[in-house]
Amino acid sequence: MTLGDTLFTLVTFLVLMLAVGKVAWKPVSKMMADRQQKISGDLDYAEKSRKDADALVAKRQEELQHSQADAVKIVNQAKENGEKLRQSLVDAANAEVTTMKKNAQTEIDQARKDALASAKNDVADLSLTIAQKLIGKELNADDQKGLIDDYIKRLGDANGSH
């Protein structure tokens, strides 16, 4: 290669570089700058999305803890209400049993009194009949009362000694 060829190649290369620089360099540079901006924007968006996701995870975790605490409170309240209801039912049953015992005792006492009164009347009638047959006469009311009271007293003494 001669100096002329080298010079020609150099000039041609420079002209070609200027032409490419004028025609293609600006669009290629713009395209590279746009691509750099897009990549930078995508990285910023990805970082923001990651931070948002982390914040959302933290928020959900906090809500979950609050939900668990609320669930524990609800369960404890339900247990407490159940225990109160159970105690109320037990108290009501105990009160009913006590009332039934009192009523039964009252009925027993009344039946005993009625039986004693009936026995007293039967004994009085029997005593009066026996006394009339033995004495052969009718007793007046005071005599009857005295005989009956005396007989009941002796019955009470006899029952008390057994």
UniProtKB/Swiss-Prot annotation:
Domain of life: Bacteria
Gene symbol of the encoding locus: atpF
Subunit structure of this chain's protein: F-type ATPases have 2 components, F(1) - the catalytic core - and F(0) - the membrane proton channel. F(1) has five subunits: alpha(3), beta(3), gamma(1), delta(1), epsilon(1). F(0) has three main subunits: a(1), b(2) and c(10-14). The alpha and beta chains form an alternating ring which encloses part of the gamma chain. F(1) is attached to F(0) by a central stalk formed by the gamma and epsilon chains, while a peripheral stalk is formed by the delta and b chains.
Membrane topology annotation: Single-pass membrane protein
HAMAP family: ATP_synth_b_bprime
Organism, as annotated: Lacticaseibacillus paracasei (strain ATCC 334 / BCRC 17002 / CCUG 31169 / CIP 107868 / KCTC 3260 / NRRL B-441)
Pfam families: ATP-synt_B
Segments traversing the membrane: 6-25
Keywords from the named record: ATP synthesis, Cell membrane, CF(0), Hydrogen ion transport, Ion transport, Membrane, Transmembrane, Transmembrane helix, Transport
Name assigned to this protein: ATP synthase subunit b
